[in-house]
Every structure is written in structure tokens, then in C-alpha cells.
Regions:
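N-terminal accessory targeting/assembly segments
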Residues: 1-110
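C-terminal-of-GTPase-core extension/linker across diverse P-loop GTPases
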Residues: 1-13, 32, 135-209, 215, ...
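Conserved nucleotide-binding/hydrolysis micro-motifs of P-loop NTPases
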Residues: 17-21, 50-52, 84-87, 106-109, ...
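Flexible beta-alpha connector loops of hexameric P-loop NTPases
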Residues: 18-23, 53-57, 115-119, 159-160, ...
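Short alpha-helix plus adjacent loop in nuclease-associated cores
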Residues: 106-128
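Switch I (effector-binding) loop of TRAFAC-class P-loop GTPase G-domains
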Residues: 184-186, 191-199, 217-249, 257-267, ...
């Protein structure tokens, strides 16, 4: 995996507060954390209050002067805008500021590029990167060449920064075909699980909510779990053996985030749809985060976009061991539990709840198999749950 921080970038964050916009200060706090994840140091921030973003330059002319002065004073190498810039906005800001210009989408794509491990993840990232760049070739070519590296130049598709629109279209077409094969493979796996009557639960949540830690603690696996944004990019599925002998498959998914780029939603559709096809949703919330309520809203909006609502949802208010942990109201959830994936607090209650949910869906059957049909009992073990068996003179009673 490529390491962040080989080339330190000093950046100024720029945001626009509009009437219909969320709190931009909080959004810039998250942007700062994203920038840090990508190896950049935030040296300042500027916010403009406007009815709407400037269609040509994102911010007004007066604010551009302020940004230029701050970039110079702090010896910054570039700026990161809190929203996705249009091609015109990118080109105009690049020309006005004479420094590297990036936006939230480019930043998140860059982090994803360094986090991708599997071939599927790399294909999805490259596809998202190329779709984003195809409309911004001129501005990005100039901006990203300023430092010869850094944010925006990482990833499987960045061995050579493509600046030819025709080549990009050809590459996108090839990636779509590769991704189509991956999606077919995923469908086969899902069909196999369905035939085996194996229930699945998708673990979803805002990035860094503790999803991978939960999966590791429950199943004893060793999925990459770090206290950083997007530590997990590729979905991981593990078998959970419940205390009563029942089993369920748990899938750890990529974390959601505020203003998740449309390019990523499209490219990662096959991965994100693990939530759509799961039998249950386990929604992990970082209960110690002051923005927990906003993060819950983002998760549900993303699930709605994916068509993954309408099934039983278990909300886990995680990190109860952390200072400031709380429990919020979740009207979209069927069940809520207080847990700590780190210490194990509350996980016994989760086990009991999963046992209850699985038991409610089971059909109990009693049958006597003649000894010549004993082989069928093995099929019961494979595709169901054998509660008891008794050998009698007539055959095997199950």
C-alpha cells in the first residue's frame, strides 16, 4: 500500500456557508481530518457566507484576494475546497490563485486510492478517478503538475497521469467490463448463500465508527482496524457462530461520509450494495463523536440512495468506553444497543438479539428418515440446523 506523507503539502481550507448548507465549520473540521489522512497539513481556513456558491469561482472576488494573501502568508502549497468544483471553477481558481487547487472529491478519491488493496477495490478507485478527471483535464493537468506528486496523483490509475480524453474513455470502458465480471462473481456468491439459507448482516456506518473493530471482536478475525478515516475500503465477510449454535455472515463495508462523491457511489456500487442484499443492517454509530446525529443522517440517506432501507436495522451506539459517549434517538432503527467493540461491552446483548431474530425466521420440522436415506441428514447439517437426532428401529428421527 502506498504511504501517505512522502510529500508534505501545506493547505488552506476554503468553504462556503449557504442558507441551505450544513454547518460549514463542522464540515471543514472533517475536511481537515481528511487532509491529514492524505498527508497534508492544514495551515488555515477561510469561510464565505453567500446565498449560493459562485458559479465561476466558487467564492467571490474579495474572498479570492483573502485566500491568495493567506496562501502567501502561510507558505501554503495549495487550497482544498469543501465542495466538488465544476471544471470552470477549478480552472478559474487555478488561474486566479496561481497555486494547486483541489476539492473534497479529489481528496477523498486520493485517500481511497491509497487504501485500495484488492483488485476490485483498485478497479473501482481508478474508475472513479477517471470519471472525475475526464471533465477536468486542463485544470487538473496544470494544478497537479505543480508539485509533481501529492494529493490527486496517487492510485492504481496514476502510474501516468492521463491527459488524453480518448484514452480515458477507452480505459473507462475496459474498467467497466472488468467490474462487470466482479459483480457477476458477487452475485454468484450471494446466490450460493441464499441456497444455503445462510443469513447475512451488513455492518454499515460513518467512516471510523468502529465497524472493523466490531467485526474483529465478534468473530476473532484480523480485519485492518485503525483509528483513521477509510481504514477499511474493501468489504470483508466473516462467519459469526452464535452461542446457541446458529450462524450468520457479517460483512464489513466501506464507511460513509458527508458529501460522499457521486463518482465513488457509482464506482463502488457493487461493494456498497452488500447492504442492499443483506438480511439485516447493523448500523454502527460513534457515540462519542459530537457530530453523531449528523453522521447517522448521512448513513441513512446513503442507504436510501442504495435502496437498502426497508429491512430490520440494529443500531449500535459504539465507543461507550470513550469520553462523551451518549445514546441518541434513532427512529429509523428497529433495535438499539449500547456497546463498545473495543471492550466487548454490550456484545452479549447483540448475540442474544441476533439469535432471537434468526430463530424467528426458522421453520421447525420433525421427520423420520429410513436408514437408507441417512445421507439426507448431512444436507440438513449443511443447509439448515440439526437440533437433535435419535436412532430408532424404524430410522433416524430428527
Amino acid at each position: 500500500m502506498e504511504e501517505f506523507g512522502k510529500l508534505e503539502e501545506r493547505v488552506v481550507l476554503v468553504g462556503v456557508q449557504t442558507d441551505d448548507h450544513d454547518n460549514v465549520e463542522e464540515s471543514l473540521d472533517e475536511l481537515k481530518e481528511l487532509a491529514s489522512t492524505a498527508g497534508a497539513v492544514t495551515v488555515g481556513r477561510i469561510i464565505q457566507n453567500r446565498e449560493s456558491v459562485h458559479p465561476g469561482t466558487y467564492i467571490g472576488k474579495g474572498k479570492i484576494e483573502e485566500v491568495r494573501a493567506l496562501v502567501y502568508a502561510m507558505d501554503a502549497t495549495g487550497i482544498i475546497c469543501d465542495d466538488e468544483l465544476s471544471p470552470a471553477q477549478l480552472n478559474n481558481l487555478e488561474r486566479e490563485l496561481d497555486c494547486k487547487v483541489m476539492d473534497r472529491t479529489l481528496l477523498i478519491l486520493d485517500i481511497f486510492a491509497a487504501r485500495a488493496i484488492t483488485s476490485e477495490g483498485k478497479i473501482q478507485v481508478e474508475l472513479a478517478q477517471l470519471r472525475y478527471r475526464s471533465a477536468r483535464l486542463v485544470g487538473l493537468r496544470e494544478s497537479l503538475s505543480r508539485l509533481g506528486g501529492g494529493i490527486g496523483t496517487r492510485g492504481p490509475g496514476e502510474k501516468k497521469l492521463e491527459t488524453d480524453r480518448r484514452l480515458i474513455r477507452t480505459r473507462i470502458s475496459a474498467l467497466k467490463q472488468e467490474l462487470s465480471q466482479v459483480e457477476k462473481h458477487r452475485e454468484l456468491i450471494r446466490s450460493s448463500r441464499a441456497r444455503g439459507n445462510m443469513k447475512t448482516a451488513a455492518i454499515v456506518g460513518y467512516t471510523n465508527a468502529g465497524k472493523s473493530t466490531l467485526l474483529n471482536t465478534l468473530t476473532g478475525s484480523e480485519v485492518l482496524s485503525e483509528d483513521k478515516l477509510f481504514a477499511t475500503l474493501d468489504p470483508t465477510t466473516r462467519l459469526l457462530n452464535l452461542k446457541d449454535g446458529q450462524q450468520i455472515l457479517l460483512t464489513d463495508t466501506v464507511g460513509f461520509i458527508h458529501k460522499l462523491p457521486h463518482h465513488l457511489v457509482e464506482a463502488f456500487k457493487s461493494t456498497l450494495e452488500e447492504a442492499k442484499y443483506a438480511d439485516y443492517i447493523i448500523h454502527v454509530v460513534d457515540s462519542s463523536n459530537p457530530q453523531a446525529e449528523m453522521q447517522m443522517h448521512v448513513v441513512y440517506e446513503t442507504l436510501k440512495e442504495l435502496g437498502a432501507m426497508g429491512k430490520k436495522i440494529i443500531t449500535l451506539f459504539n465507543k461507550q468506553d470513550a469520553p462523551g459517549a451518549c445514546v441518541l434517538r434513532d427512529f429509523k432503527s428497529d433495535y438499539t444497543l449500547k456497546v463498545s467493540a473495543k471492550t466487548g461491552e454490550g456484545l452479549a446483548d447483540l448475540n442474544d438479539l441476533l439469535e432471537k431474530l434468526l430463530a424467528e425466521e426458522q421453520i421447525y420440522v420433525e421427520r423420520l428418515f429410513p436408514y437408507q436415506e441417512a445421507g439426507k441428514i448431512q444436507l440438513i447439517r449443511e443447509y439448515g440446523q440439526l437440533i437433535s437426532e435419535e436412532y430408532t428401529e424404524e430410522g433416524i428421527a430428527v
